[in-house]
Structure formats: C-alpha cells, structure tokens
Amino acid sequence: MAAPGFLPRPDFQHLLTALTAAGYLCLGPKVRDGAITYEELGSTDDLPRGVHDHQQPGAYRLHRDESPRCFSWANGPQALKPLLFAPRETLWTSAAGSDGGITFHPEIPEALPTAVIGVRACDLAALRLQDQHFLEGPSPDPHYGIRRRNLFLVAVHCT
C-alpha cells in the first residue's frame, strides 16, 4: 500500500483523467434521491460542493451551502460492499461426461477496473475485515478476489 498523500484541488481532474485513460471506471459521491451515493464521475465538476449531512437515529438529511468543499459529510447509506459482492452470480457450471460422470467448471467473473473516489476510514476498516475473511482465510473467495484486485481506492480524511 502506498503512503498517504495530499492531492491539491487543481490536480484532482488530472487524477480522474489518468484513471479513465488507464481503463478505470471512476465512481465518486453524487447526490441522488436525497442521499450521497457512489456513481460514475466524468469530471471533478460532478462532485457535489457545499453539501453537508445531518444524521441522528432514524434521520438522514442533506443540506447545501456556498462552501467549495466536496467531501464535507459523514458516510452516506451506501458502502463499498455492493462493488465487491454481486447480488446473484453463477459460481460454477457442470456437464455430464460420456462416462456418466459430472464435470464441474468454476465461473470466474470479469471485473471492470473501478476507482472509487471519496472512501472513508471506516470503509477502509470494513474492507480490511472483508479481506481477512474472503482473501486471507482458509478458503479464499475467487469472486471477491478478482473484484478486490480491480478496485483502486482514493480515500478522503474525515474532519
């Protein structure tokens, strides 16, 4: 893992352009249906500026102001998990052999290289736990592994 660094705002678009040129689908925070969700980013202009959240038990509301800040909210209702686990997928197929036996063939998904902009420390901590279980355990999950290897994360500091 690379050492953390600071990316000045004028260089942020260069990062998105480089990731896109390298074949990554760039996802980042956007406002949809009153919540912050990860969606495709075309440019840094797509990032919501001046959006803040107010959370309490049973409530989640977004508010806007004139602030130029792009990441001034806590985590939204969406996490990284949907990017790593498909709701349904074929794990294997089988075929009957001429000898009457059955042959099983694993189905390994193709994963699009995906860059996620705006990941929080709590997301990284949860991802580490998933990695321990699904990559480093006694039976690594190849489906999780291929998606995880194709994931590029850009974290932001929670203040």
Show the residue positions of the predicted features:
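Iron-sulfur-associated redox domains of electron-transfer enzymes in respiratory
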Residues: 1-159
